[in-house]
Amino acid sequence: MMNENVEVVVVGGGYGGVTAANRLARRDGVSVTLVNPRPDFVSRIRLHQLVTGSDDAVEGFSEVLGGNVRLVVDTATRIDAAERRVSLAGGGTVSYDYLVYAVGSGASDPGVPGAVEFAHWVSDLEGAERLRAALAATPASAPVTVVGAGPTGLETAAELAEAGRKVTLVCGNVLGPSLHARVRRPVARRLAKLGVTVLEGPRAQVTDVTRDGVRLDDGRELPSAVTIWTAGFRVPDLAARSGLRTDAEGRLITDTTLTSVDDERIVAAGDAGVMPDHPFRMSCQAAVQLGPAAADTILRRIAGKKAAPVRMFFAGQCLSLGRDEGVTQFSYPNDKVNALSISGGLGAGVKEIACRFTLNKLVSGARKASSRASHGDRLESPQSKNRSTPSGT
């Protein structure tokens, strides 16, 4: 039993932040505050479904966050490591003894002329909602271009095509670069069945985006009423702005215990941190493991013990290709893909099970945290009446 109460602030309420907060809140003597710019939890692995209306991709924090976790709806603007204080956009500050840096990731500026001005993103709630509105204002027969053939691009292209849209997928090189060559085949067959035009090859690169089209590296110009950019992610620049060391993608640099190389009181969880010698793929699968691991690092330090290196286990990647079919790409525990897969309707079922399992894991964590203490005031929200809060944490 700890003699003094320890204050832990979790910055970011995604998969990593929520799992870390719930784990910490189970421990007596630890008070947890979660700072997040939105009053709801965003189920990011369902954002492509929000675009077509098959899911709203949002859960109330009351469902996934322990009742003894204090929720502050605001945007963190700076971390003062020396004073152990987080400044908020609403004008206040939150002090901490330990901090979990879990700001997640979002779309990056690809540096392609016109992309920022005219393309849409599916990497956050606001972007997905804007895309949905743009599609609603566009005739169903109008051409739609999806740029990037990673998981987000594949799922978005298939979802739109199944909804009756005329979709072109510009791969940037190869279809499904994170997939095994054998697993790309059922993906290609499914996209062809849905009527998606797939452009592959070294010159299948978008070099310019306009209001009504895209230009490729080989000179081709494609009409596009709605262009969706899914290639590349970057984390918010909060760590860099706070004077903490980051990598080229803006991720907080940590050691093998997820601890910032600049301050042992700051621990990263999810997409926002990186161990340079052991980088993990930015993913929900990684985040739900890194959140509890970050919490354990802090709890061990509080108890006067040495923090242990993080251990990860990966099972594969689940992709939905519309509502009726999908592909599950299996991997070795180190996240290296192999040739094993499940496709078709069974693949779609596995994806749906994975999504529900992830949500159930968060709900279970919230219940365990809530069982430790009585419920108090949960929500402090200078922006709680405004759903469209600033992007990024």
Residue spans of the language-model regions?
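Conserved N-terminal Rossmann-fold NAD(P)-binding element of oxidoreductases
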Residues: V11-G12, Y101, V147-G148
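Rossmann-like dinucleotide-binding core of oxidoreductases
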Residues: P143-R189, K193, T197-L199, M282-D296, ...
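FAD-site-proximal beta/loop scaffold in flavoenzymes
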Residues: E117-A140, V214, E221-V226, T230-Q289
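A conserved FAD-binding loop/helix module that cradles the flavin
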Residues: A240, A248, A272-G322
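C-terminal auxiliary extensions adjacent to catalytic cores
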Residues: R323-T393
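Beta1-alpha1 glycine-rich phosphate/pyrophosphate-binding loop at the start
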Residues: M2-R70, E155-A181, G392-T393
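A Rossmann-like FAD-binding core segment of flavoenzymes
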Residues: R70-I79, V86, V94, A163-T256
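FAD-binding core/adjacent interface of flavoenzyme oxidoreductases
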Residues: M2-V6, V69-P143, I228
